[in-house]
């Protein structure tokens, strides 16, 4: 067949032949983020539901989880997840993903509340119970809302379940004028650990941490970056 075709009738192609899906791998990053968020939330909901059923004899959330998985899988159809659907379709997709996250939040919160009600929280200060839905031990920052600080006093320290003081830090709160508390929690896999926020009376114990950012005229520097800024234009020069 090719031998019978005139040579000048064959076009010269100098670009990608697979042009119909151009850009769809980056289009609608929101739907890709929501898809992954729902996947992780559903896996965690399965764990919490199992824990609640086995340990607390709570109603099984299997049917709700199954329906939520069907919603996620439907939205993994290639036109939707790839980003090639029309914008109106993604309004429905956002609502669908929202219903999935609502389902997983309800299951998680129900089980956590049931477990928390059975934890001994007597003692000084206010208990801070940190849960870990992953099957391995993690060390992760925990943010304590300013409402606990208002209840206990201005200065707080954090101790673990053995009474050992945990380094903590005041940070800017999510509400205007408030300061939250930040500390690192070490929590076993598929478990919880109880910390306590205790008021610091008298002279508050305060230690200056390592200076993370060095600032001088036209220079910002930390362990990884040294950025010089033009004092007139504000542009980064190096």
PLM features: residue spans?
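Glycine-centered coil/turn sites that cap beta-strands in beta-rich domains
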Residues: 140-148
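Beta-strand-rich N-terminal accessory domains
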Residues: 133-137, 198-238
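Catalytic-domain carbohydrate-binding cleft regions of carbohydrate-active enzymes
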Residues: 1-133, 140, 152-171, 177-193, ...
């Amino acid at each position: 067949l090719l031998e019978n075709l005139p040579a000048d009738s064959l076009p010269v192609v100098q670009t990608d032949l697979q042009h119909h899906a151009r850009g769809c791998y980056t289009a609608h990053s929101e739907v890709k983020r929501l898809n992954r968020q729902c996947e992780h939330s559903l896996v965690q909901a399965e764990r919490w539901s199992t824990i609640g059923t086995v340990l607390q004899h709570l109603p099984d959330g299997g049917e709700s989880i199954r329906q939520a998985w069907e919603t996620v899988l439907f939205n993994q159809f290639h036109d939707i997840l790839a980003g090639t659907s029309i914008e109106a379709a993604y309004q429905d997709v956002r609502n669908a993903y929202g219903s999935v996250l609502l389902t997983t939040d309800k299951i998680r919160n129900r089980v956590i509340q049931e477990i928390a009600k059975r934890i001994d929280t007597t003692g000084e200060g206010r208990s801070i119970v940190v849960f870990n839905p992953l099957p391995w031990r993690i060390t992760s920052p925990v943010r304590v809302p300013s409402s606990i600080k208002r209840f206990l006093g201005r200065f707080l320290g954090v101790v673990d379940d053995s009474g050992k003081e945990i380094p903590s830090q005041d940070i800017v709160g999510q509400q205007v004028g408030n300061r939250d508390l930040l500390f690192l929690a070490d929590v076993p896999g598929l478990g919880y650990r109880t910390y306590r926020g205790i008021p610091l009376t008298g002279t508050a114990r305060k230690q200056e941490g390592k200076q993370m950012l060095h600032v001088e005229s036209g220079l910002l520097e930390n362990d990884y970056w040294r950025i010089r800024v033009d004092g007139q234009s504000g542009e980064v020069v190096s």
